[in-house]
Each structure stands twice: as structure tokens, then as C-alpha cells.
Amino acid sequence: MRTAIALAALCLFAAACERAPESDAAFGARVKAWMMAHPDDLRAALENMQTKTGAEDAKAEAASIQQAQAALPRLRAALERDPRDFAANPSGKVTVTEFYDYRCPHCINIASKVVGLIRARPDVRFVFKEMPIFGPVSEHAARAALAAKAEGKDYVGLYAAMMAARPLDDAEIDRLAAARGVSLPAIDAPAAIARDDAQIVQTEKLAEQLSIDGTPGFIVGDTIIHGEDFDQLVAAIDKAKAKA
């Protein structure tokens, strides 16, 4: 806010008079004096800047949403049918795709509801997109989950356990994975790391095309949901089911 006020003052001051050669301190003093003498003009300028910025942000957001919606049809197969991703309830008539990180607070908050939905709604096919954006520990967790998928282990159980773990570190990830029969050497094998990292990069690019720049993000039919709004997720599922 202080920066915006200063910018508004400088713009108005520059419009009111040309700056003569002088020291920065002297110029700053003159700007401050002008601000004190013209509070109403300064307030009006600041409000105008905020209105303009808000309108520009809203316009950019609307354009981004429109582009993401337009991209959905051509990205549908990558979203819902990538054989590298784990899909719970594979025979479900409606597909939900989640982009998430095991250390994302919002992903953690909604995770138990996601697991409950998977268990309560066998008609809902749920695709997991590993998108670790919180650093090396998140990347290790994603690789552990992908190893569970590759080995046919309890993916949903590992997902739930890692989301619930406090704290989640490499040792805890390995413990939880091993408890579900995942081969720990398979997680960090060079070939597995290269394969998984390539998949994660592709997932991030897919999310970018859908204007998903954070986690969690959900796709249900033609609906893109940003954040942990479970009620919106359920509503989108019911809407998609009605169309199926």
C-alpha cells in the first residue's frame, strides 16, 4: 500500500510540474510536501490506480479461464487416460483428475475427503497427477507413489498416509512406502528417477495449459476447480454424472 501511494504521488507530482535538477533528498522532500498539501488528489489517484489494476487483473483472469476451457477437449486424453497415472475406481463413469503435492496445506486439508469420496463413490473414477511443487521432499514422495503404482501396491493407502504424516520427510516416506510393500531401491534407482521426473515435468506442463499454477487443482468434465473447495468438487461430479 505504501508503495502504491508513493507511485501515485510521483505520478501526480510529475504531471503537475517538471523536475528540475536537484538532489534526491530535495526532490523527495518536495514530493512529501506535495502529498501533505493535496491529500484528496492523492487519494483519488490511488483509487483510480487500484480500480484500473483490478479491472486489468480480472480481464487477464477471465482470458486465462477461457483459454483453459478451450484447451480441455484436446487435453482430455492426457488428463484422464495417461497409463502412467494411477486411477482409483477405474470403471467409474465420471472422471476426476487431481493435481497435488503431499506437502501442500490445502491438499492435506482435502485429502481425507478425497479418500472418503473414492471409497463411497465407486461410480467416480479418480486420476492422481503427481505435481510436487514444494521441493525435494515432495519429489521423493511423488516418486514413492509412482513406485507404488508401478509395483501394483496400495496407492490410495500410501497417498492417504503421506498426506496425514507429520512431519513428512524422506525417512517417513520410505517407512510408509515400505509398510505397503514398495521396494525402496526402486524409488531412487537412476532409471526410475529419470522416468518419474520426465512424467512430473509433463504433468506440470499440462497443468500450465489449464492455468493450474498451484495445488490442489481438480478437473471434472468441463469444470476446473482451483483449491480445496470440496462442495464445488461434489457439485461438479454430480453435474458431470447427470450429463453422462
Regions found by a protein language model. Name each.
Residues 24-78:
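Extracytoplasmic c-type cytochrome modules immediately beyond a signal peptide or single-pass transmembrane anchor
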Residues 13-16:
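C-terminal motif of bacterial Sec signal peptides marking the signal peptidase cleavage site
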Residues 97, 108-179, 208, 212-213:
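Structural alpha/beta surface segment adjacent to cysteine/selenocysteine redox centers
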Residues 104-110, 217-219:
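The canonical Cys-X-X-Cys-His
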Residues 5, 19-34, 52, 178-244:
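C-terminal cap of thioredoxin/glutaredoxin-like
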